[in-house]
Amino acid sequence: RNTILDREEELSSGDWLMVVRNNYFWLQQSIESLVNDAPLASDAAASSTMQETEKDGNGTNGISFLANGDRALVQRVRNVREVYGFRFADVWLQFPDYDRYELQATVVLDSLNTEAPALTPAQNERLFQEVMADYADIPLKQERLKKMRQDKLLNAIQVKYAYAITCHKAQGGQWAHVYLDQGYMTDDMLTPDYVHWLY
């Protein structure tokens, strides 16, 4: 990425990312801001905005959540910061597989370069505990957890660079047809191990 694209920043406009853990939070935030930003000049105007929003799946072009494997193009990166020992950035993302749907969200940068597929269970637990400590002033555990479910950093999207996608990660959803040229193969070469690898 650094050599071919000449990008020195960890994340910049034009980068391709892949969501590596399902996320339900940010689309809900997007829907709420769309509804809250509806003009209040008249009930008819607000109703019209609501109808437009509902026509295409609550204003999200039919996306119900950000799924593991969804690709996004970074439009802008702002407010890179370190909190709780993790690095976060506010980003504007465009999802080409969903009619170029755009979303403003927070991503956790630590997942970009890890060897693991996403943040490890230990990292997730550490982040959870750090966020929980921030809400320690709320005495009732149920209320504290309710507040935490709305925390933007705890719900930051976990992403990886998406310059190369394995067939497994794409889950067949990226292409209508896939053609494999395996070259010249003799019957001896078509072993169960090879077929398993091919799959």
Write out the residue ranges for each language-model feature.
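Core RecA-like ATPase module of SF1/SF2 helicases and allied nucleic-acid translocases
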Residues: R1-Y199
